[in-house]
C-alpha cells in the first residue's frame, strides 16, 4: 500500500448535508462505551438516551443502541437522540460511542467495509499509512466490543431480571395481609378477571 491510502475520509461535521451518521438505522453502543462514560462522569447525562433491543425471535440478538427521535424537517424519518438538528451536530461528539468514532469504516470479522455509502466525507482529505492503521485498529476494537456486548447482554439481562423478581417477591412478603389482598384485587381488575369470592363477600358485608 502506498503512503496515501486508497481509503480517505474527513468528517465534514456540521457542514455535512446527508446526516448519514445521525440517521443510520442503528447507532450501536457497547458495554465498554458505558464503562467509559461512567469513568468520565457522563453516564447519568447519556444513559437516558440509551435503549436495549429485546430479541423478537430466537435469531435476534440483544444489543444496546441510542434512542431515536423524529426529525423536525421530516417527521417520517428518525435520527439518533443525540443529534442536534438546529446545529447539525452531535451533542456528545467528543465522547461519542465507538461505533460513531469508526464510522463509516467497519470491520466485519474478515475485512474492512464501508457501513454507509451516503457519507459525503468518504473520499475527502488524505489519510496517511499510519492514520489508516489507526483507523483499522479502532474498527477492529469496535468489532471486538460489539461481539463481546452481544455475547454478554443475555446473561446481564437475566441477572437483572432475576434480581428484580427477587426484590418484588420480598416486597410482597413484607406486605400486610390487608395490603396483599388489595394488591391481588388490583391485579385481578387489571386482568379483567372476576373478583374472588372472599373479596366479593367482604365488599357486600361492608
Located regions from the model:
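Short loop/turn segments that flank or connect secondary-structure elements
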Residues: 1-206
